[in-house]
Curated annotation (Swiss-Prot):
Annotated positions of the ADP-ribosylcysteine modification: 332, 366, 375, 394
Organism expressing this protein natively: Mus musculus
Modification comment: Auto-mono-ADP-ribosylated.
The keyword Lipid biosynthesis is assigned to this record: no
InterPro entries: ARTD_PARP, Poly(ADP-ribose)pol_cat_dom
Ranges of compositional bias, category Low complexity: 757-775
Reactions that this protein is recorded to catalyse: L-cysteinyl-[protein] + NAD(+) = S-(ADP-D-ribosyl)-L-cysteinyl-[protein] + nicotinamide + H(+)
Biased composition, class Acidic residues, residue ranges: 123-134
Domain of life from the UniProt record: Eukaryota
Positions of the UniProt region annotated as Disordered: 113-134, 289-310, 748-775
UniProt-recorded name of the protein: Protein mono-ADP-ribosyltransferase PARP8
GO MF term (any one): NAD+ poly-ADP-ribosyltransferase activity
Role according to the record: Mono-ADP-ribosyltransferase that mediates mono-ADP-ribosylation of target proteins.
Ranges where the PARP catalytic domain occurs: 615-842
Length: 852
């Protein structure tokens, strides 16, 4: 936040201690020294000299270690600054002459505050000893009151957050003596589906904390704050936080600079012209570490204020974060944003539209159609977020003057053709209503209780992400800056809210939109730009392979097998996409595997050097890595890439959640749709219903499918089979049809319910030999696979007997993935349309995808 370096802050604290000691006539300490991040001083006031050591870390004052020469093994770990530590030791020595007093003090404080700490999950020391030490730390100049020197604009912004989101949406920790404050903004992510949250390693019942470290007394006029992003329960391993932290730091830095040019307060409060000074300004360069948990939240799963004025929280979120800028040549309106509920249908609206230059329609309804004519005469205004219906004062809106109101912006620059395309799909009725070329507007529907999590992202249909059948990159709507009409903190929350649902659409390093043929996928990843690849692999952004193998070894085993199949295919030039981007471990400035200089033989050599995943689970990972590095230094980096480049969420299903009729132990839950597509899918499902069907494809194709999604291969170089029934994704309710597309019937026979019992017995015998740990991993390189998908039963679904064609990729979502090895056969007579089969599928899905 523009403050002094760590060393300067530490030196200032040490100088305070030395100056304070020299000013005392009967000082108990001498020989003050500081070197190698360790501050030492010697107690000389007793019969025995004792040396105390304070070792500071990189995140000082957090993780500060205190020990004495009398007891080196008993070390105190504290978050207090050096002056506080020194004062407590001196105070206790005068009372007890206990040379290990610093440790006893800490024990005492922890005991006294243990109850409060458990309730608040924060480090707050309120004992009398703390007050004494704080008086020393603050120089005794003031009896510190946390509210005394807080900047008035900060007060106003905090009030705006609490009013809009509820009292638990923001918490802060003040350090008045060092002119610092930690502002924790609690971002609700409960709208994410459980499986999507798991794929992103996010706890959806716990808010994401965006912490701002800024000046308590200067606020927007002070230095640019630093930003931290975390969840309390996943602080150690929160991969999404790296991406979001960089996004929020960039946003805060840009908006902070603009704030310095604007000293006005939009809340109507008069700011004092008197310059506010913080007590003990010599500590102004100190700043607390972000490691403190936010006060009042801790492990409590407190959510944001669920309802306000009768509108659900997710609907409010949609209303605040989403809008569209419609390009129309026959309208004078330049910016027409509609959310939440629409105006009542009124033929006069078309005529009145031409008088509007620029306005924003928010998610609150006008009281009646009769009053819209009066409302539309306003030339430039923003409608209040609070509901007008039921408020008699709104009947007099003819006297309204142009004014600022509480609108939010999620710009998306949709063209007219896109809007009509959305309307034709009947997906606008719930969340988006705009008919620029018609005289009537569709009614918005109030979300019911069951669809509250849906209402946030279902309203992003065609806005947060383009149609997956389009080759256009995502729009920059998620990057649009919300209007600051409720203060900087509300603006920051809104920006975080609109970025989180679409993090997967942007590179985790450069934050530029991914450009994929089939639209965004589920898991966030890095783009193919070389600088981003270097940063991703060398700066520790991606997860370690060891972590993935520890939590999902069978999935890693499958990913490696798919990579091998694609690489061994005679069609590898076409289907081995993406090609690896791997930094050379011996030369971090070069790419060992470069998509621009493809060398398939070298990749295969490295792949052959990867130790089997089963062996990795049976020995220390570091030893396995050393063996791989010795055999081929590119083997382990390639394994890292195979894991991190996977953009789908795959989980090995436990035995009790497997589909028994599929006759294979290798069953996986497979989700590849991002939140926006999944929400579009559920909205379409509510309109048309859905069913299940198989999709067969050679195992060599799945390396690309997991990273690019199911694509329409018809009439492209990816097409392997004929497209007799037109362009689209081919599915079948019959397993025998899809088994054929997977190539299973070429080298092995598909079993049937009517075959002799001897065939089934031999199959069962081969499977029974692979029990225990060995059966969890793939034993053969001759693999066949089949996917079970959920498909929307809309008029767009073309059924040609047992072959179905889906031209719209948004109407197909993968749910399960089944792998067969040599000796394993599937049932050719499975029909997903049979009641028993369909019921079993729904049982296994359960609540995992929120589609059952």
């Amino acid at each position: 936040m523009g403050m002094c370096s760590r060393q300067e802050r530490i030196q200032k604290d040490i100088d305070v201690v030395i100056q304070k000691s020299r000013a005392e006539k009967d000082c108990l300490f001498a020989d003050f020294r500081y070197s190698d991040s360790t501050f030492t001083f010697t107690y000389v006031g007793g019969p025995k000299s004792v040396s105390y050591s304070v070792h500071v870390s990189e995140d000082y004052p957090d993780n500060t270690y205190v020990s004495s020469s009398e007891n080196d093994e008993d070390v105190l770990v504290t978050t207090d600054p050096i002056p506080v530590i020194f004062h407590r030791i001196a105070t206790e020595l005068r009372k007890t002459n206990d040379i290990n007093c610093c440790l006893s003090i800490r024990s005492k404080l922890q005991k006294e505050n243990g109850e409060e700490s458990r309730q608040n999950s924060t480090v707050e020391e309120d004992s009398e000893g703390d007050n004494d030490s704080e008086e020393f730390y603050y120089g005794g100049q003031v009896n510190y009151d946390g509210e005394l020197h807080k900047h008035p604009q900060l007060e106003a912004d905090l009030s705006a957050v609490r009013e809009l989101y509820g009292p638990h949406a923001v918490s802060l920790r003040e350090y008045g003596a060092i002119d610092d404050v930690d502002i924790d903004l609690h971002i609700d992510v409960s709208f994410l589906d459980e499986e999507i949250a798991v794929a992103w390693e996010v706890i959806r019942t716990e808010p994401i904390i965006v912490r701002l470290h800024c000046s308590l007394t200067q606020y927007l006029n002070g230095p640019v704050p630093t930003v931290d992003v975390f969840q309390i329960s996943t602080k150690e391993r929160f991969g999404l936080g790296h991406q979001l932290k960089k996004i929020m730091q960039t946003f805060v830095s840009q908006q902070w600079k603009q704030s310095k040019d604007k000293s006005n307060c939009p809340h109507g409060k008069k700011l004092s012209e008197k310059k506010v000074k913080s007590p003990l300004h010599l500590f102004s360069t100190l700043r607390r570490s972000p490691s403190y948990p936010p006060p009042g939240c801790g492990k409590s799963k407190s959510k944001l204020k669920p309802e306000q004025d009768g509108i659900s929280k997710t609907h409010k979120l949609l209303r605040r974060t989403c809008s569209s800028t419609v390009k129309a040549d026959d309208m004078c309106a330049k910016s027409h944003r509609t959310f939440g509920r629409s105006l009542s249908s009124d033929p006069r609206a078309e005529q009145a539209m031409s008088t509007i230059k620029s306005h924003k329609l928010l998610g609150r309804p006008c009281p009646s159609a009769g009053k819209q004519e009066d409302c539309l005469t306003l030339k430039s205004h923003k409608l209040l977020t609070r509901s007008c219906s039921g408020d008699p004062r709104c009947e007099h809106n003819t006297n309204l003057k142009p004014h600022k109101l509480l609108s939010r912006s999620y710009s998306s620059n949709l063209r007219m053709e896109e809007l009509y395309g959305l309307k034709n799909h009947k997906l606008l009725s719930k969340s988006y209503s705009s008919a620029p070329k018609t005289s009537k507007m569709e009614h918005f529907k109030e979300p019911n209780a069951e669809g509250r999590r849906l209402s946030l992202t279902s309203g992003l249909i065609g806005i947060l992400t383009p149609s997956s059948s389009s080759s256009q990159p995502p729009t920059n709507g998620a990057k649009s800056i919300p209007i600051r009409d409720r203060g900087f903190l509300v603006q920051t929350i809104e920006f975080a809210e609109q970025r989180i649902p679409v993090l997967n659409e942007y590179c985790v390093v450069c934050d530029e939109p991914h450009v994929f043929q089939n639209g965004p996928m589920l898991r966030p990843t890095v783009c193919e730009r070389e600088l981003c690849v270097f940063a991703f692999q060398t700066l520790g952004v991606m997860n370690e392979a060891a972590d993935e193998i520890a939590t999902g070894a069978q999935v890693v085993d499958l990913l490696v097998s798919m990579c091998r199949s694609a690489l061994e295919s005679p069609r590898k030039v076409v289907i081995f996409e993406p090609y690896p981007s791997v930094v050379d471990p011996n030369d971090p400035q070069m790419l060992a595997f470069n998509p621009r200089k493809k060398n398939y033989d070298r990749v295969m050599k490295a792949l052959d050097s990867i130790t089997s995943i089963r062996e990795m689970t049976q020995a220390p990972y570091l030893e396995i890595k050393k063996q791989m590095d010795k055999q081929d230094p590119l083997a382990h980096p390639l394994l890292q890439w195979v894991i991190s480049s996977n953009r789908s969420h795959i989980v090995k299903l436990p035995v009790n959640r497997q589909l028994k009729f599929m006759h294979t132990p290798h069953q996986f839950l497979l989700l590849s749709s991002p939140p926006a597509k999944e929400s579009n899918f559920r909205a379409a499902k509510k309109l048309f219903g859905s069913t299940f069907a198989f999709h067969g494809s050679h195992i060599e194709n799945w390396h690309s499918i997991l990273r690019n999604g199911l694509v329409v291969a018809s009439n492209t170089r990816l097409q392997l089979h004929g497209a007799m029934y037109g362009s689209g994704i081919y599915l079948s309710p019959m397993s025998s049809i899809s088994f054929g597309y997977s190539g299973m019937n070429k080298k092995q026979k598909v079993s049937s319910k009517d075959e002799p019992a001897s065939s089934s017995k031999s199959s069962n015998a081969s499977q029974s030999q692979k029990k225990g740990q060995q059966s969890q991993f793939l034993q053969s390189r001759n693999l066949k696979c089949i996917a079970l998908c959920e498909v929307i039963t809309s008029p767009d679904l073309h059924k040609h007997g047992e072959i179905w064609v889906v031209p719209n990729t948004d109407h197909v979502c993968t749910r399960f993935f089944f792998v067969y090895e040599d000796g394993q056969v599937g049932d050719a007579n499975i029909n997903t349309q049979e009641g028993g089969i369909h019921k079993e599928i729904l049982r296994v899905i359960g609540n995992q995808t929120a589609t059952g």
